[in-house]
Amino acid sequence: MKEDKILVLDFGGQYSQLIARRVRECNVYSIIKPYNISIDQIKDINPAGIIFSGGPKSVTGPEAPMIDKEVFKLNIPILGICYGMQLMTALLPGGAVEKARHGEYGKARLHITEKDKLFEGISDSQVWMSHWDRVKKVPDGFKVTAKTDITPVAAMGNPELKFYGVQFHPEVVHTIQGLNIIRNYLFKVCGVKGTWNMADFINEEIDRIKEEVGSSQVISGLSGGVDSAVASTMVHRAIGDQLTCIFVDHGLLRKGEAEQVKRTFVDEFNIPLVYVDARERFLNRLNGVKDPETKRKIIGEEFIRVFEEEARKLGDARYLVQGTLYSDVIESGSETAETIKSHHNVGGLPDNMDFKLIEPLRNLFKDEVRKIGEVLGLPDEIVWRQPFPGPGLAIRIIGEIDGKKLEILRKADSIIQEEIKEAGYYKEIWQSFAVLPDLKSVGVMGDTRTYGYPIILRAVTSDDAMTADWARLPYELLEKISTRIVNEVDSVNRVVYDITSKPPATIEWE
C-alpha cells in the first residue's frame, strides 16, 4: 500500500524545494531526492505520487539529466513540471521535444482546452513560464489539455496511466491557480488524505537529531534572527544541556542587535550563551576587500575559526548547528542547479572545517520556519524578525568596509526599521533595509555644496525569497524616511528607492 508521501525528483531547478513546500502546505508529507535515484530506492520510499521538477538543462542536449525509464512501470502517478514534462515526453513512446523559435519567460495566459482531473475547478488564468524547449508531439495515449499564445502544449495528460505534465510552474505564486492544480494532483490523482503537519516535522527532526548526535557535545551560533533561534531551540529540545550557544559579534550587526541577542536568548531560552567580541578581528580581515564573494568567504571562514577556538575552550564539541534555509542552498548551487551566489551558511564555509553540521531547517523556507517558531512558543519579536544575512552589513556596504561606513549604515538602517514599524508595514514586508554604495553625489544643504553618500532603500514583498517584488510603500512614508536619514545621518545627502524585483535582481545587493 502506498503511503501518503510525495517524492519530488530534483533535476536542478531553482524551484525544486518550492514544489515540496507547496505539497506540505496541503498537509501532505514530501521529500526531495536527486533525479538519479535508483528504482529500488523509489520502491523503498513507496510514494503515493512522484513529481519531476524543472531544470536548467535542455532535454535534447548531451548533458541532460535523465531517469531510469522503469519509473514509468511502477504504477505510481507522475506529474512533470517544465523540464519534467519535456523529459516525460522524450522518454515515453511517441513523444517529441523541440527547441522553440522563441522562449517563453514570465507571465503567460493559460487556455485550458480539455478538462481532466488536474484542471478540475480551474479556469483560464495567469501562469509562470520559464522555458525554451517545448513539446512538439505528446506521447502515445496523452491529450493536450492546455496551451498559451506561444506554447501549443502547455499541459498534457494520460488519465489512464495517471501521468500528467505542465510546461508552466504551478509552484510559484505568479501562477494564480497553481496551488489548486497541485491540490488536484495530490487529492484527485494520487488520492492522498492530507493529515501531515508542522508538529509532525518537528517531532521527526528532534528524533533525527537525537539519533545523529547521541551523547556528543554541540555548539550553535546565534545571530538573533529567527533561523538560528528556531534551529537552536529544536536542537535544545532534542539534546538539552549538550548544547551550548555561542554569539559572535563580528562588528557587522545592526544597531542594538548584540545587546538584544544577549538579553533575549539568556532570558527567554534559558540556554547557556557564550558572547565573543570579535569585532576587531573581522574588520581587520576585511580591510581593503571589495569583492562581495571574497567578503562572504572571509566571513564564513573566520566565523568557523572563532567557533573552533571557543569549542576547544568548552570541551569536545563535534557538531555545529546552523540555521541554513533551502533558499540559501538554492542560491549556492548544486550539481545540476546554477550557482547565483554563495551563502555564508552554505558556500561560505571552508572545506577544512572541524565540525559536522546540523541543519534542521535546510529543507524549509522562511515562512515555514516562522510557523515552526510559533509552534515552539518563541516570542513574536524573534519569530517575525525580518531576514538578516549571515555576513551582516558587510554585504550591504558596496566596496571596502570601515568603521565610519558601518556607523552611517547602522544609523540609516535603524531609521528605516523604526519608520516602517511605526507605519504598520513591518510584518507585511519581507525585508526592508539600507544599502551604502561605493560612490558619492553632489548635494546642497544650508546653502552649502555637499559631497556625500547616497543611501539606497530596499524594501521587498515575498512569500519565500525565491521571487520578490519591490514594496509599494506610501510616498508619505518614503518622504519621512528620506527626510530623517539626510537630517540625522552624517555624510548622507541623498536617498534613493530600489524598485527592482527578483528576478532579475537578488534581494541583497551583494
From Swiss-Prot:
Residues 5-195 form the Glutamine amidotransferase type-1 domain. Residues 196-385 form the GMPS ATP-PPase domain. ATP binds at residues 223-229. Gene3D superfamilies: 3.30.300.10, 3.40.50.880, HUPs (3.40.50.620). Disulfide bonds: none annotated. It comes from the Bacteria. Keywords: ATP-binding, Glutamine amidotransferase, GMP biosynthesis, Ligase, Nucleotide-binding, Purine biosynthesis. The active site is at residues 82, 169, 171. GO terms for cellular component: cytosol. It catalyses: XMP + L-glutamine + ATP + H2O = GMP + L-glutamate + AMP + diphosphate + 2 H(+). Its EC number is 6.3.5.2. The keyword rRNA processing does not apply. Pfam families: GATase, GMP_synt_C, NAD_synthase. Pathway: Purine metabolism; GMP biosynthesis; GMP from XMP (L-Gln route): step 1/1. The keyword Ligase applies. One of its GO terms (molecular function) is ATP binding. Catalyzes the synthesis of GMP from XMP. Homodimer. This is GMP synthase [glutamine-hydrolyzing]. It comes from Halothermothrix orenii (strain H 168 / OCM 544 / DSM 9562).
